[in-house]
């Protein structure tokens, strides 16, 4: 039993604001240059073809195309943007 009733409760009740991390564009989705694909802390996903990396490890598209996630032989996950060739009819 607590000796004083509210001793602990006044020290609780704080939490940090969520950072909205995670995948923003999933595999197969269309992107244009500049679109954010993944927000992350550290390099959980590494940049592949046509993908840039920001100073906070955000991955973003460098060209228009389709997002692709793949795991290479070194067991790292890579995010690439595959350019889509548009056919004119």
Curated annotation (Swiss-Prot):
Alphabetized GO MF terms: structural constituent of ribosome
GO biological process, one term: translation
Protein name: Large ribosomal subunit protein bL27
NCBIfam families per UniProt: L27
Top-rank taxon: Bacteria
Keyword annotations of the record: Ribonucleoprotein, Ribosomal protein
GO cellular component, one term: cytosolic large ribosomal subunit
Region annotation Disordered: where it falls in the sequence: 1-22
SUPFAM superfamilies, A to Z: Ribosomal L27 protein-like
Family designation: Belongs to the bacterial ribosomal protein bL27 family.
